[in-house]
Amino acid sequence: MRLAFRLAAIIVGLSVCSTSIAGPVPSIIPQPVSITEKTGHFTLTETTSIITHGDSLAQPAAWLTSQLHLKQGGGGKQRILLEIISDKTLRAQGYFLQVTPSTIRIQSASPAGIFYGMQTLLQLLPADAPEGASAPAAPQGASAPAIPCVDITDYPRFGWRGLMLDVSRHFFTKQEVEQYIDQMARYKYNTLHLHLSDDQGWRIEIKSLPQLTQHGAWRVARTGRWGEYLPALAGEATTYGGFYTQDDMREIIRYAADRYITILPEIDIPAHSLALISSYPNLSCTQLPYSVNPGARPPVREDNALCIGNDSVFLVLDKIFTEIAALFPNPYIHIGGDEAYKGFWATCPKCQKRMADEHLGNVDELQSYFVKRMEKMLNAKGKKLIGWDEILEGGLAPEATVMSWRGMAGGVTAAKMGHHVVMTPWDYVYLDLYQGESAVEPPTYGLCKLKDSYTYEPVPDSVDEKLILGGQGNLWSESVPNFRHAEYMTWPRGLALAEVYWSPKAARNWDDFTKRMEVEFVRMDHAGIKYARSAYNVTLIPKRMQGGEITVGMSTEVNGLDIYYTFDQTNPDNTYAKYDGTPVKFPVGAGQINVVTYRDGKPIGEQVNVKKDDLIKRAEQGHHVY
């Protein structure tokens, strides 16, 4: 389902009181820089017109017209004005939004700023409206939605506000990627990083290398838990996968550009290259035939690394990046560079000869040689190189931008060297990690809770903020087999990160955010977007006591919830024992604790049931989940 809700549905479904008294502060994510409430409201009707000043606004005006089912350039008394202005007080991508009883005015120095102002405008509309009607706005006899009168000044803290979608481990269709783009646009994201290649699939057509999609895009079908799948059997049909033709990708790029989102392509090299090597076996050190990995544990680690001593590797990569550079307008191309096992390079005659010829002292310097050579290749095609923080190993390429994922240390190192950085530390922004109590979450690994994402600060005190381009959330898809689950893993952590990357640091307030998040959940319900309510669930915190006994603490991320529990294996409600903040002991003979959350006398979280033996294991390992 496409972006936002349809205004016609709001009109049919709501009856709005026409009071002139200023109401509560509007619920907007990400939080604007400045918002001033006024009295009164603007009433949206079918005669409301959208008027533009400047040819560059034709596309955003058409987009807003389609969202609100209004007329563009008409003569109604109620008007929405879109204006390009020159105002030195307004930062890049910023906008002014003014709502009066007769006029909505969105002003910016750029069409992108106008578009971001539109997203805020849509969030000023009532949230609790049915979805899907297609009648024009405010037909005769229908109640018209009221937009509160406000003055908003807004601009982003960072220029890079992204999400990464791994389409290699599991393939998502063009239509699903466009849905993801629509969802990103609601919250003013501007970069979609597509992880287009890995050991489990090659996802972009390269016309000069047809084997990449004829062979590398497909693998044997498996279901179960990632890493435990059976390897491909001899002669087994490869029926699972897919790829984007270049025409598909042009449509995605254009679709994203219409929403002021740029696509960052990633071709992961020199490691994570099994789909490439499986298609062209001469590119690895072993030159052995391999199957595209279906999600099984690899029999050896090093089979997925390109042979850096093989000149054919660079000829193939030049073909790939010639087509990638021509296809994607983004000035950056991501080359991966992560998790390269270097053992085969250490024993490969070709790699050893390369090291001798280039006077390289070790295999880290060999990887650095590779990255620097790739930077020259991309620069010659008019592109800039970006890679994961492992590209620091052995020496960083002169102009490379570092995407720091193993914590923030790599980003700090790169920034102190004067390089640009995109912060993406796994423990704050990896959207494939558990987001709550593992007993009620689909299986994955690690832990990144909603509050972790919201409280994350992308700029360490020790670096120049100007070198931090921004950041992104990363959705690796090993444990994300379908698009609905991709939505579930993205939201609401994606809401938290949208605010981290857009709003002023000082404006962040956890309790206020969770209230606004709940309003956004209503919008998501009507838009058909799946999201997680994990922040309302109990997290159990076990502790092993002397004598072998175990106590259990309980907490929730959202404040103000009541927790009820039982040890008798029944389903607790708000008549059961209430947790008072003091860790509780397991009674003699009890083998399980069941807990649930309530607010204002009504259940709000899922019931969580965890066995005592599992809690003991967690206590011994120092884990709260998994």
Where are these regions (language model features)?
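Active-site neighborhood of glycoside hydrolase catalytic domains
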Residues: 276-282, 294-400, 405-413, 417
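Feature activates predominantly on carbohydrate-active enzymes
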Residues: 90, 96-314, 319-332, 373, ...
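Contiguous, structured surface segment used for ligand recognition
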Residues: 23-158, 485, 501-511, 516-527
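Bacterial N-terminal signal peptides that target proteins for export
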Residues: 1-8
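Flexible, acidic glycine-rich loops studded with aromatic residues
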Residues: 384-400, 406-553
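Bacterial N-terminal signal peptides
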Residues: 8-18
